[in-house]
A protein has these predicted regions:
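Glycine-rich FAD pyrophosphate-binding loop
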Residues: 1-17
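Active-site-proximal flexible loops/turns
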Residues: 12, 49, 130
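Alpha-helix N-cap/helix-start motif
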Residues: 13-14, 72, 123
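Catalytic-loop motifs flanking and including active-site residues across diverse enzymes
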Residues: 16-20, 126
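Dinucleotide-binding Rossmann-like beta1-alpha1 core, especially the glycine-rich loop
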Residues: 19-103
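Short glycine/proline-rich turn/loop motifs
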Residues: 107-114
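Helical element adjacent to the flavin cofactor pocket in flavoenzyme catalytic cores
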Residues: 114-134
Length: 134
């Protein structure tokens, strides 16, 4: 096998990457269930085979009632938790933001929200490890 790079291996990775290993929660809104399921399944693979470079993260999604009803967000997160056969990360859940640690740093107008999990990766190391294993 031959690998040709313009610069160093993974040279531009950090500037273009979000460093997230995620399933694409936003794609559920466009009914891209297959894409989300495949992405979540791949996230599980990376979490399983490279735990030394992947860090689970919890995200707080404040609820804005004028944008979407809470039931819709709950339904989306329910699907997100199940589409990829989630086994490694915790399932999502609803929280009261005005009396919990989850609301720290958020504007006081947010009363409730949702917590879901994805993961962050050392993207340059992932590229190098992938190239080495090819």
């Amino acid at each position: 096998m031959l690998l040709v790079e313009k610069d160093d291996l993974a040279a531009a990775t950090s500037s273009w990457s979000t460093k997230l290993i995620h399933g694409g929660l936003r794609y559920l809104e466009h009914y891209e269930f297959r894409l989300v399921g495949e992405s979540l399944a791949e996230r599980e693979v990376v979490l399983r085979i490279a735990p030394h470079i992947v860090e689970p993260l919890s995200f707080v999604l404040p609820h804005e009632p004028h944008l979407r009803p809470a039931w819709m967000i709950r339904a989306g997160l329910f699907l997100y938790d199940r589409l990829g056969g989630r086994m490694t990360l915790p399932r999502s859940f609803g929280v009261r933001l005005d009396d919990s640690r989850w609301g720290a740093g958020l504007q006081h107008r947010f009363r409730r929200g949702f917590v879901y999990a994805d993961a962050r990766v050392d993207d340059a190391r992932l590229v190098v490890l992938t190239a080495m294993s090819a």
